[in-house]
Structures are given as structure tokens and as C-alpha cells.
Regions:
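Bacterial N-terminal signal peptides that target proteins for export
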Residues: 1-8
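Bacterial N-terminal signal peptides
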Residues: 8-16
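N-terminal periplasmic/intermembrane-space "pro-region" immediately following the signal or transit peptide
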Residues: 20-230, 242, 620
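Hydrophobic, aliphatic-enriched repeat segments that assemble into extended interaction scaffolds
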Residues: 102-133, 139, 243-259, 263, ...
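Outer membrane beta-barrel
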Residues: 109, 227-374, 390, 394-409, ...
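Outer-membrane beta-barrel pore domains
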Residues: 225-228, 409-620
Length: 620
């Protein structure tokens, strides 16, 4: 029994220690109540000890009687047992309450917030007349197969230039297809060992005039008349959960989980149609409709006030999406660090910054866009054949940031850029041979070459003039190729061209009127952006269903109305109109083609498109 008392006293002491160590964020009323209960328990233990002492004395006087007859529980013993049971129950209840208090205190250190958004879209698109570049490449490969020596896997048939005057392009294409069908095994063996370098060498061995004449001739068999591409209705769900935890005065952790999907589709993989948002890559998994999987959009720690200065360090999956001025049309605060007109792209990296004062902040940023040494079969390649990592290095300078005025400079350079990024997609054609893939399957796309560097510079300025918010964004891009091309092309060039430097630009302006009659709950906005022929930015995660609007090589007009039905319940009506001047918007590879005349396109593209959207967003 005394051992039980000792255990109970130990529990009582531990409970008291736990209370004293309780986080300062616990409610004062809970702590006071528990202290009162501990005092009561102390008194109960003292009373129980007195009863046990009396019981021991009674036992000593009755030892002879207990030796002569079976032991019977005394009244004192029964009372002591009852008291022990009551005390044990009280201590257990106290432990449960203290554990709950500790749990509540821990949860109070993590702040949860987020939003859910429903949208309904109607899309109208127009594809202009074009020549199918994938089919053209396929006819070229089949011609090379027919004329290649048998020692190289071909059929060894001489090429007669006069054939171009004897048959129409369609007839010649039919003859080639029939020839391949009759020699399909040989053709498969030929294409299985074919590389892009082999293809370039074969084309390069032909007289330039003959290549040009053959391409022009074959082109006639690949013409596709323009057509409409409309989607009457498309529904989407987006859910985002944000977690913030302050671990110390100068240390915090932030994360955001996101789910974004189209109704009726959770595959997470799209059929590749030539648009930059149809390839699921590390940079856009939550910026375009994907699946019902909750993905980590951002997760990083921030160590601030290092050495009691304005210096800070932040490492992790960066807040690099929805940066200014993209937040105006969503009626929400700044969502990301870099300019959204230049970079709207998820990536992992490091930021070292210095807060000069309350209005001025300087940041140096580093990130990785492609990691060659993991998951890409490096060990299967000789060292000289392995790709280099794609690194991002940049600076972000918030020159002046106040409640009404914002001025920002963003500079970035991407080193050793590859022909795309690791991703998942469903390819309908082999990009090397142009052959149709009979049973399209989900495949991992892995880059094949480093193509050069890309430079980006952007300046954002915004100001509030009473009920009117306005912004202007000026941006520059520079493609700096290293001379290498792939089946998709080089930096700003087609596969069989020699890449050269190209510069591009984009201007983006917007104005928003906050209706003063209802305290700005209703907002009317208009935005316009224009991109030049060789304009490129990293905006694959930009949340525009058709395509990221700031990618556009041409003009985009957007007008919208947002209305806060409640402070955290927002209704939005939006209309977007795209007018494309050149192909390849959103791509750093391939030469832009004017859409005024029927161009050769690897994949169909819009010359104009529009979208009407209705959305409802709840925030918590």
C-alpha cells in the first residue's frame, strides 16, 4: 500500500512538473483549475497517509486474532482501498486533461488556412490552316529508309528527282506507306537504330537544293485545313491547404498542399497536344488540372534576423507561383516572391535575403530545374554523354513596397537548359520518326540534350489611386543557344537549323476599379499583355486553362468582375481572349512561325481562342 502511495505521489509530482512546463499559450483558466485540483489531490494523499498509519496501528493490536482466524477486511482497510481507487481515478483524469492541454498547445503553434475554388469554363478555339510537321518528318524518314544502302538497314532504292513531277505528293505518300507496309520488319529495324544525329547526317549528305525541293514536294501531302476546337463546358475543383508554424521568434516553417482537377478526370497525365501545359512536369503539377492527389506545392523554412540583422535564409520548395502582378485578377494578396510575369513555376531552391528596411528587400535565389543524376539512367550513359543539371540563379529586389506602391526588379538566368523537363505524358507520335504510336501509353519524358542558357529581366510597378489599382510590367527574354538541336528543335530554332541568339519582350498592363459604394467588395478589372516573336518565360504553372496567358506571342485581353458575397466567399466572372501572332508560345525550343499563312507545325496551335469562366472561391 505504501508503494502505491509512493507511485501516486510520483505521478502527482510529474503532473505538477508538466503543468509548470506547460506552454505559455495554454489558457490561464485551464492552468488555474489544474493547480486547484493538484492541491486537492495533495490533501487527499495526506488524509490517506493518516488513515494508513491508523490502520497499521490497528493491525498490530489484532495480530493474534488474525493468526487464529481467517483475515477479514477491516473498515479502515476498506475505506483506504476506496480512497486509493478514487485517487487513482482522479490522477488518471488529470493525466488525460493535461495530455489534451498539451495537444491543444502544440496545435496552437500551427496555423491552418486555405481555400476551395469551383470554376466552370466555356472555351472557343480556332486552329488555322497548317502543314502537319510530324507527318512531314515521317515521310522524310520513310524516303531515307527507301534510299538508304542495305548496309545501313535501308532498301537501297535510288532516288529519282523526276518522281516529283510524275506523281502528286499524295500519290507519292501512298507509295511510301505501301512500301513500308510490305517491308515493315526491315523498317522497324531501321527506325529502332535511328538516332537524331543519324537523321541529320543523312539529310546533310543530300544536296541542299534537293532537300529543299523534296521538303516542298512532301509538304503538299500534309496540308490540314483549319477547324474549330470548342469545349462547351469544363468544370474544375481546386483545394489548397496552407500550414504555418512559428518555431521561434526567428524561425518558421510554411507549406501549402494543393489539389487541382477537372471533373471526371483524375489520371494526372494528359495527351500531349503541343501546348506547354499538356506535359506534367515538376514545375506545373498544381498549376494545371492534374488529379485528386494532394501535392506539395511549397514547403520551406525561413531563418530570419540572423545575427540580429536583416539577413535571412530560406530553403525548400519555393513560393515561386502567383507572384505580382498576377494576384490582382484573383482579388488576393501577393502569392509568390518573383515576378509572375517572368516566373510562375514550381521549383526547389534556396533564397538568401536582406531586409534593408520595412519597404526595401533584396534576395538572391538559386534553384534546380532538371536533376541529371537521379532517375534518368545516368549509369547507363558514358560520362561524356550525360546531361548537365539545369540550374537557376536570380535576384529579386523589392525596391519599394508600401500599402499603395510597389516597385520590383527580377533578374534570372537558367544555365544548361534542356529540351524540356522530366515529366509524364501520353505521346501520339514518335517525335523522331513521326510514326503514329498505335497504342498510346503513359510515358516518362526525359530530356536528351543541353541547349544553352536563357536570360530573363522584368520590372513591375503598381500603385493605388484611391479606388483604382493599376500596374505595368516590362519584361525581356534572351535565348543563348550552344548550337545543339534535337527532334523538337534548339533554342528558338527548328531541328535542322543552326541556332542563333534571339531576344524577346513582353509588356503587361492592368487596371482594377474597387467599387466604393460597397467598400470595394465589388471589383472591375481589365488586363492586356503583348509578347513578341521570340518571347519566352517560365510560366508553366500559371492557372489559365487554355494556356498561360503571359506566354503568348501575340495579344491577350482579359476583363473580369469579382464580388465578395462574404468576406471569405468570392464570386468571379472572367473573359479571356487570345490572339496569337506566332506559333510556339510557351516553348523555348523550335522556331516561331507566323500564323498569317499556313505554317509547318509539329502540333496544331490556336491562332485565336477565348474563354468565359464563372468561379466561386471560399477561403478559410
Amino acid at each position: 500500500m505504501k508503494r502505491t502511495i509512493t507511485v501516486l505521489l510520483s505521478l502527482l509530482v510529474c503532473s505538477a512538473a508538466m503543468l509548470l512546463a506547460q506552454d505559455s499559450s495554454s489558457k490561464p483558466s485551464d492552468a488555474a483549475e489544474m493547480r486547484q485540483e493538484i492541491d486537492q489531490l495533495k490533501k487527499m494523499v495526506a488524509d490517506l497517509q493518516a488513515r494508513l498509519d491508523a490502520q497499521d496501528k490497528a493491525k498490530a493490536q489484532q495480530q493474534e486474532q488474525q493468526a487464529q482466524q481467517p483475515a477479514q477486511p477491516t473498515t479502515a482497510a476498506a475505506q483506504a482501498a476506496a480512497a486509493q481507487a478514487d485517487l487513482t481515478t482522479s490522477v488518471q483524469d488529470l493525466e488525460r486533461r493535461m495530455l489534451k492541454s498539451e495537444r491543444d498547445a502544440a496545435l496552437s503553434k500551427v496555423r491552418f488556412s486555405g481555400d476551395y475554388r469551383f470554376e466552370a469554363h466555356s472555351i472557343w478555339g480556332n486552329v488555322p490552316n497548317f502543314y502537319d510537321g510530324m507527318q512531314l518528318q515521317n515521310l522524310m524518314v520513310k524516303t531515307l529508309f527507301a534510299t538508304a544502302p542495305t548496309s545501313q538497314g535501308g532498301l537501297g532504292m535510288p532516288f529519282d528527282p523526276n518522281i516529283m513531277s510524275q506523281y502528286t505528293p499524295q500519290q507519292y505518300a501512298g507509295m511510301l506507306n505501301q512500301l513500308v507496309n510490305h517491308n515493315y520488319g526491315t523498317y522497324q529495324a531501321y527506325t529502332n537504330q535511328l538516332t537524331f544525329n543519324n537523321l541529320k547526317q543523312a539529310v546533310g549528305s543530300m544536296p541542299p537544293q534537293q532537300v529543299s525541293a523534296l521538303m516542298n514536294y512532301l509538304q503538299g501531302a500534309t496540308y490540314v485545313p483549319g477547324y474549330k476546337d470548342d469545349t462547351n463546358i469544363l468544370y474544375t475543383n481546386r483545394f489548397r491547404l496552407k500550414l504555418d508554424s512559428k518555431l521561434a521568434d526567428n524561425l518558421s516553417v510554411t507549406a501549402r498542399l494543393s489539389m487541382y482537377k477537372a471533373w471526371g478526370d483524375s489520371t494526372g497525365v494528359q495527351v500531349f497536344d503541343g501546348q506547354p501545359n499538356s506535359l506534367s512536369i515538376d514545375g506545373n503539377t498544381v498549376g494545371t488540372p492534374n488529379s485528386d492527389i494532394l501535392r506539395v506545392e511549397r514547403a520551406f523554412f525561413t531563418w530570419s534576423k540572423i545575427g540580429n540583422t536583416g539577413l535571412y535564409l530560406s530553403i525548400g520548395r519555393r513560393p515561386s507561383t502567383s507572384g505580382p502582378p498576377m494576384n490582382y485578377r484573383e482579388d488576393e494578396p501577393r502569392g509568390g516572391t518573383p515576378s509572375g510575369a517572368l516566373i510562375d513555376f514550381q521549383f526547389d531552391g534556396i533564397t538568401a535575403g536582406y531586409r534593408i528596411n520595412d519597404r526595401t528587400e533584396l534576395r538572391a535565389c538559386y534553384g534546380v530545374g532538371y536533376q541529371s543524376g537521379f532517375g534518368n539512367g545516368d549509369i547507363l550513359e558514358l560520362p561524356q554523354d550525360r546531361l548537365k543539371n539545369t540550374h537557376f540563379l536570380g535576384g529579386n529586389f523589392d525596391i519599394y513596397n508600401s500599402e499603395k506602391t510597389f516597385l520590383q526588379l527580377t533578374i534570372a538566368r537558367a544555365f544548361d537548359v534542356t529540351d524540356g523537363f522530366n515529366g509524364l505524358t501520353v505521346m501520339t507520335n514518335n517525335p523522331l520518326t513521326g510514326d503514329v504510336i498505335g497504342a498510346p501509353v503513359v510515358m516518362r519524358y526525359t530530356p536528351s540534350a543541353n541547349l544553352g542558357a536563357i536570360n530573363l529581366i522584368g520590372v513591375n510597378f503598381s500603385h493605388s489611386f484611391g479606388p483604382v489599382d493599376a500596374f505595368i510590367s516590362g519584361n525581356y527574354s534572351g535565348l543563348r543557344p550552344n548550337g545543339i538541336t534535337t527532334p523538337f528543335g534548339g533554342l528558338g530554332s527548328d531541328p535542322f537549323e543552326t541556332p542563333t541568339n534571339h531576344d524577346g519582350g513582353m509588356v503587361y498592363v492592368g487596371v482594377r476599379y474597387n467599387l466604393p459604394q460597397n467598400d470595394g467588395r465589388t471589383k472591375f478589372g481589365f488586363e492586356f499583355n503583348h509578347g513578341s516573336k521570340y518571347w519566352f518565360n517560365f510560366a508553366q504553372a500559371q492557372d489559365d486553362i487554355i494556356a498561360p496567358k503571359t506566354n503568348t506571342r501575340g495579344n491577350v485581353y482579359e476583363t473580369y468582375i469579382t464580388h465578395r458575397i462574404k468576406s471569405r466567399f468570392i464570386l468571379k466572372l472572367d473573359y479571356l481572349k487570345y490572339l496569337y501572332n506566332y506559333s510556339g508560345s510557351g516553348w523555348h525550343i523550335g522556331a516561331p512561325k507566323s500564323l498569317d499563312a499556313a505554317p509547318i507545325l509539329g502540333f496544331p496551335t490556336y491562332d485565336r481562342a477565348s474563354m468565359l469562366s464563372l468561379g466561386m472561391t471560399t477561403r478559410f
